[in-house]
Structure formats: C-alpha cells, structure tokens
Amino acid sequence: MKVGFVGWRGMVGSVLMQRMKEENDFAHIPEAFFFTTSNVGGAAPDFGQAAKTLLDANNVAELAKMDIIVTCQGGDYTKSVFQALRDSGWNGYWIDAASSLRMKDDAIIVLDPVNRDVLDNGLKNGVKNYIGGNCTVSLMLMALGGLFQNDLVEWATSMTYQAASGAGAKNMRELISGMGAVHAQVADALADPAGSILDIDRKVSDFLRSEDYPKANFGVPLAGSLIPWIDVDLGNGQSKEEWKGGVETNKILGRSDNPTVIDGLCVRVGAMRCHSQAITLKLKKDLPVSEIETILAGANDWVKVIPNEKEASIHELTPAKVTGTLSVPVGRIRKLGMGGEYISAFTVGDQLLWGAAEPLRRVLRIVLGSL
C-alpha cells in the first residue's frame, strides 16, 4: 500500500506526524510518500520511508499512484484536486482534515471511538472518503459519546469556549501578541502596588478599543475579550460553526435520517488550543447522576469523568490541564432545576489532537487493517 501525505508541515499536519511517530505508525505503512505545493524535488522528512524526495501535490498523475492519500492541506486544496483525481479514475482512499467533503453522501466523518461501526460498514461497502469532523463536535462526542451511543439524548445545547488554534496558527500568535501588548500598556502601573486598578482598567479598555491593538487575523480583540461568533453568517441568525454541531453529530452517529436536535452558540475565547463546552442535555429518561457518570466513563479509553466538586473541577476541567494530552475530561454533571431529565456537563479537549489529528491517524491505521 502506497500512502501519500499532503499538508504535513502545517499545524494539524505537524501534530499528525508527531503522533504517528509516537505510535510507530510508519512501521505499518509499506510505502510512504510526501507531497508539497511549494518545494517539489526538495528533501522529504525522514520517517524511515524509502522515498526521499518531495512530490508535486498538484500533479494528479503522481497522486493517482497512491492507494491512500492523507491531507491536512486545507479545503481549497481539496476543492482543487479531489474531483480531478476521482475523474482520472483513481479509486483510492482519501483521508482529509478539511471540511469540504464532510457532508457528502459518499463520505464518512471519522471518530472511531464513537462510530467504529459506521466506519467498518463503510469499509465493507466500498466507501473511500474518510473525513475529519468539526473539532467541537468531535470533542463533545468523545466526552458524551456514551449517552448518544445508548440513544439516551432527546436534545442537547452546547455553549462553546473555543480556542484560538481553531482559527489557525496566525491567530494563535495574534492572541499571544495581544496579551503581551495589553500588558505592555500598563506594566509600569502594575508594578506600583499603590497604583489605582481603575486607572489600569481604563488604560486596558482604551487600548482594546484602539487601532493599535493587534487584530489583523481575528478582526477584533481576543485577549482581554471574547468573540461571540465563529465562521460565516448563514443569514438565519446561526453561524456555520453552530450549524455543524447538529448536522455533523448526527452524521457521525449514522442518524441523519432521524436526527437528535443539537444547537447552541459558539464563542471564541483566549485559550490557546483547547476547546471547552458547557452542555445542557435533555435525556429520554430520568437517570441517577451516578448511572450517567458510569455510562460516560465506560464509553472509551480517553474520556475522564471529573467529580462535580470545586477543587476537582478547577484543577481538572481546564485548558491549562488538558492541552497537549489525549484526555477528554467531562464534569459539572448534575441535575438541573428544570426536571430530572435535564443534565448539565462541562468538557474540555485538545483541538489539535482529538479535535483534528488523532481521528485521522486512527482511521489510517483502520484502513491499513492494523487497528
């Protein structure tokens, strides 16, 4: 099997390569090839593969020699080569981090700890397009998959606290630049214990509203603020990110024909690479909290139920704790005042791992027959 990698140098691609190295995945790949859009003929990264030269990612004939293509190059790349590649007669596996093909009928959204049955059926039935899901959707399902898999959810609403990484590497840099720029405005005043906090606050507020604040990528301040809209405006009051929550969750679960209603608001906050979500669920039956926790904890190897206590919550349910790990903690689980079927939950997950690279890494192994 020849496996071609495109977009392996970008943020998601780099995380994917690191994870594949950690898990010794290249030992399961008979022949690996690396493609580029900008450095054709250059030296390929060395993961022990025979092919040492970078190939042209826009050359359909070269791509067509692959049995599997894994791309983290983005949606524009997918739109530019995918159909031409299929039209050339190529019948290989296309594994893609971008959203372009997610909702196509001949594509499966990959999240094997949650929908391995859907993946296995797809492989049996000749499906060749395996697409990574929206990061918040994947992270929500990793945390709450037990309830969805047992068909216990009547509806759910997710209010998100999404990290800068979801918008890209430049946006992560801009967040840090913003933090530093805010501090620089008031560094001297902060160093004076007798300084007025109201004066400091006014200087910060004035700076956030000024044209000097670095906001070329987000368009508005994030450090010291938040952004209550993510992705394009669908024109009906909903953002595309919010729309994805319902349609992608149901597609992942194989329930597009009989969907569970899921909606909410998506908000960008000043976290680096962990998305958090506050979720309200209406269950189909009134279950004890202890039973709900047992169902959640048993769903996969990465979800971690955090006791609904202050100390556990503030130490375990934060981006600072979770970033860079595969752990998906879920806590703040309790009955809400509206009735016994109404449950709250709060979950955190790394947007670049289970939110992006890890499902692709694992579906590659599944397609190769080694997971």
Swiss-Prot record:
<dbReference type="GO" id="GO:0046983">
    <property type="term" value="F:protein dimerization activity"/>
</dbReference>
<keyword id="KW-0220">Diaminopimelate biosynthesis</keyword>
<dbReference type="GO" id="GO:0009088">
    <property type="term" value="P:threonine biosynthetic process"/>
</dbReference>
<dbReference type="GO" id="GO:0050661">
    <property type="term" value="F:NADP binding"/>
</dbReference>
<keyword id="KW-0521">NADP</keyword>
<dbReference type="InterPro" id="IPR000319">
    <property type="entry name" value="Asp-semialdehyde_DH_CS"/>
</dbReference>
<feature type="binding site">
    <location>
        <begin position="37"/>
        <end position="38"/>
    </location>
    <ligand>
        <name>NADP(+)</name>
    </ligand>
</feature>
<feature type="binding site">
    <location>
        <position position="244"/>
    </location>
    <ligand>
        <name>phosphate</name>
    </ligand>
</feature>
<keyword id="KW-0560">Oxidoreductase</keyword>
<feature type="binding site">
    <location>
        <position position="193"/>
    </location>
    <ligand>
        <name>NADP(+)</name>
    </ligand>
</feature>
<feature type="binding site">
    <location>
        <position position="268"/>
    </location>
    <ligand>
        <name>substrate</name>
    </ligand>
</feature>
<feature type="binding site">
    <location>
        <position position="351"/>
    </location>
    <ligand>
        <name>NADP(+)</name>
    </ligand>
</feature>
<feature type="binding site">
    <location>
        <begin position="165"/>
        <end position="166"/>
    </location>
    <ligand>
        <name>NADP(+)</name>
    </ligand>
</feature>
<dbReference type="GO" id="GO:0009097">
    <property type="term" value="P:isoleucine biosynthetic process"/>
</dbReference>
<comment type="pathway">
    <text>Amino-acid biosynthesis; L-methionine biosynthesis via de novo pathway; L-homoserine from L-aspartate: step 2/3.</text>
</comment>
<dbReference type="InterPro" id="IPR012280">
    <property type="entry name" value="Semialdhyde_DH_dimer_dom"/>
</dbReference>
<dbReference type="GO" id="GO:0004073">
    <property type="term" value="F:aspartate-semialdehyde dehydrogenase activity"/>
</dbReference>
<dbReference type="InterPro" id="IPR011534">
    <property type="entry name" value="Asp_ADH_gamma-type"/>
</dbReference>
<dbReference type="GO" id="GO:0051287">
    <property type="term" value="F:NAD binding"/>
</dbReference>
<dbReference type="InterPro" id="IPR000534">
    <property type="entry name" value="Semialdehyde_DH_NAD-bd"/>
</dbReference>
<comment type="subunit">
    <text>Homodimer.</text>
</comment>
<protein>
    <recommendedName>
        <fullName>Aspartate-semialdehyde dehydrogenase</fullName>
        <ecNumber>1.2.1.11</ecNumber>
    </recommendedName>
</protein>
<feature type="binding site">
    <location>
        <position position="162"/>
    </location>
    <ligand>
        <name>substrate</name>
    </ligand>
</feature>
<feature type="binding site">
    <location>
        <position position="102"/>
    </location>
    <ligand>
        <name>phosphate</name>
    </ligand>
</feature>
<feature type="active site" description="Acyl-thioester intermediate">
    <location>
        <position position="135"/>
    </location>
</feature>
<comment type="function">
    <text>Catalyzes the NADPH-dependent formation of L-aspartate-semialdehyde (L-ASA) by the reductive dephosphorylation of L-aspartyl-4-phosphate.</text>
</comment>
<dbReference type="GO" id="GO:0009089">
    <property type="term" value="P:lysine biosynthetic process via diaminopimelate"/>
</dbReference>
<feature type="binding site">
    <location>
        <begin position="9"/>
        <end position="12"/>
    </location>
    <ligand>
        <name>NADP(+)</name>
    </ligand>
</feature>
<feature type="binding site">
    <location>
        <position position="73"/>
    </location>
    <ligand>
        <name>NADP(+)</name>
    </ligand>
</feature>
<keyword id="KW-0486">Methionine biosynthesis</keyword>
<feature type="binding site">
    <location>
        <position position="241"/>
    </location>
    <ligand>
        <name>substrate</name>
    </ligand>
</feature>
<dbReference type="InterPro" id="IPR036291">
    <property type="entry name" value="NAD(P)-bd_dom_sf"/>
</dbReference>
<keyword id="KW-0028">Amino-acid biosynthesis</keyword>
<comment type="similarity">
    <text>Belongs to the aspartate-semialdehyde dehydrogenase family.</text>
</comment>
<feature type="active site" description="Proton acceptor">
    <location>
        <position position="275"/>
    </location>
</feature>
<keyword id="KW-0791">Threonine biosynthesis</keyword>
<dbReference type="InterPro" id="IPR012080">
    <property type="entry name" value="Asp_semialdehyde_DH"/>
</dbReference>
<keyword id="KW-0457">Lysine biosynthesis</keyword>
<dbReference type="Pfam" id="PF02774">
    <property type="entry name" value="Semialdhyde_dhC"/>
</dbReference>
<dbReference type="GO" id="GO:0071266">
    <property type="term" value="P:'de novo' L-methionine biosynthetic process"/>
</dbReference>
<comment type="pathway">
    <text>Amino-acid biosynthesis; L-lysine biosynthesis via DAP pathway; (S)-tetrahydrodipicolinate from L-aspartate: step 2/4.</text>
</comment>
<dbReference type="Pfam" id="PF01118">
    <property type="entry name" value="Semialdhyde_dh"/>
</dbReference>
